[in-house]
Amino acid sequence: MNGLLASDKYVVIVGLGATGLSVARYLHLRGERFSVVDTREHPPGADELMALNNKVDHHFGAVEQPQIDLLLNAAEIVLSPGVDRRTDFIQAALKNNISIVGDIELFLREVQVPVVGITGSNGKSTVTALMAAVGAKAGFKTCAAGNIGLPVLDALQENAELYILELSSFQLESVSRPGLTVACMLNVSEDHMDRYNRFVDYCMAKQRIYFGAQNVVYNIDDKLTQPPIVDGVARRGFSLSKPIEEGESAFYFSADTGNLCAAKDNLINIDQIKIFGRHNVANVLAVFAMADALNITRAATCAAVQEFSGLDHRCQWVAKKRGVTFINDSKATNVGAAQAAIAGLSASFKRILLIAGGDGKDANFFSFGKLVDAHVAVLILMGRDAGAIADCVSDTTPVVQAQTMTEAVEVAFSSAEEGDLVLLSPACASFDMFAGFEDRGRQFAAAVEGLTE
């Protein structure tokens, strides 16, 4: 699958950062001629790019006519996922029939081993990490890459026998036909409305993961994840209740027994799973379905699931003080993720005191407000869109505004009782107040540690 990039013209990388830099390394190693365009004056990765090749053609700053001409005459544009396809100069290239791809497309042209792709509004990183652990437990040299952190083109250096890719909607936009060994969509809820004109556009980007797949795994409980019916494509569904229709291979949770099941077989009991919440039961079911598609034994899958304790900042246990549990779900950067955490944890605690807020990315908080009214005893809000969230909560739910994470944690703890949960699950991005969701989670943990009992 080599040699698919044209060599008589420049390939243009639009957007540097971690992904763009990985593309530059990939093209440089293959002797391809390329140029780099980034609208930022000092984009991350600029020094590394110069160290790679100090003569590389590049433009940092506002895109003007010379850069537009370059794009309109490119052999191919490799677009970083952080760059909005609605940008004027990208739209001009599309109208000029210039091929626009992403690093995932380049990776899939190159790779010769099985590739599993995982998308969804929530749970992608957790499921990707767990699926990689399952692959390793089954004896494959396995590599997790993509949106989880390691750029896929850098992952080629791992020479893995099995790749597990976390794929965002932005990455899927720039792949023509993924053709994955297994394609999985966990769930779909409103997110990134600052990057999409309509919710349906976001859903359509997610659906691209199924194009050309050999096996598809989807959430029976979420109609938006339903894949198209294609002859020869094996379908596996998962559900938090036993499906009424038995026409397809289904992996489900039996509330009566606490068992995760496949047909009439018990796979594992919920008590053997270390990660919190019903939403993580769904995630584990998805992993069993994907492992089945890869012909990985259930024994290997069970062993990996039992050992997996989750990822930082995803429903992560922090401490228990004065009988009050603290959980860090800072990675809940959208409404759907926070709703999954609240609904999934509410049955395990007397009350929930929720810390939320931040950059809402133009989300609609109406459904979030209804869930808060039903399950949250006290809502502590912070960040840019605190007011937008407060407007969607009824007057019967106590709402407190906090200016810092320390203040939010102290307010929550002072209002909490034994058996309660203080949950950081913001339903928003973090960049209005923090360096990222990791920084937000660390500040939460530090504030909890600083509490006096």
Swiss-Prot record:
Spell out the GO cellular component terms annotated for this protein, sorted alphabetically and separated by semicolons: cytoplasm
Q: Which domain of life is it from?
A: Bacteria
Residues bound to ATP are G120, S121, N122, G123, K124, S125, T126
Pfam families attached here? Mur_ligase_C, Mur_ligase_M, MurD-like_N
BP term (GO), one = regulation of cell shape
SUPFAM superfamilies per UniProt: MurCD N-terminal domain, MurD-like peptide ligases, catalytic domain, MurD-like peptide ligases, peptide-binding domain
Per the UniProt record, which EC number(s) apply here?
6.3.2.9
Q: Where in the cell is it found?
A: Cytoplasm
Query: Example GO molecular function term?
Result: ATP binding
Which keywords does this Swiss-Prot/TrEMBL entry list?
Answer: ATP-binding, Cell cycle, Cell division, Cell shape, Cell wall biogenesis/degradation, Cytoplasm, Ligase, Nucleotide-binding, Peptidoglycan synthesis
Kindly tell me the pathway this chain contributes to.
Cell wall biogenesis; peptidoglycan biosynthesis
Give the first-level EC class, as a single word. ligase
Catalysed reaction per UniProt? UDP-N-acetyl-alpha-D-muramoyl-L-alanine + D-glutamate + ATP = UDP-N-acetyl-alpha-D-muramoyl-L-alanyl-D-glutamate + ADP + phosphate + H(+)
Q: What is its main location?
A: cytoplasm
Report the record's disulfide bonds.
none
Q: Which NCBIfam families match?
A: murD
- Family recorded in the similarity comment: Belongs to the MurCDEF family.
Protein task? Cell wall formation. Catalyzes the addition of glutamate to the nucleotide precursor UDP-N-acetylmuramoyl-L-alanine (UMA).
Entry protein name: UDP-N-acetylmuramoylalanine--D-glutamate ligase
User: Which species?
Assistant: Teredinibacter turnerae (strain ATCC 39867 / T7901)
Gene name, per UniProt, is: murD
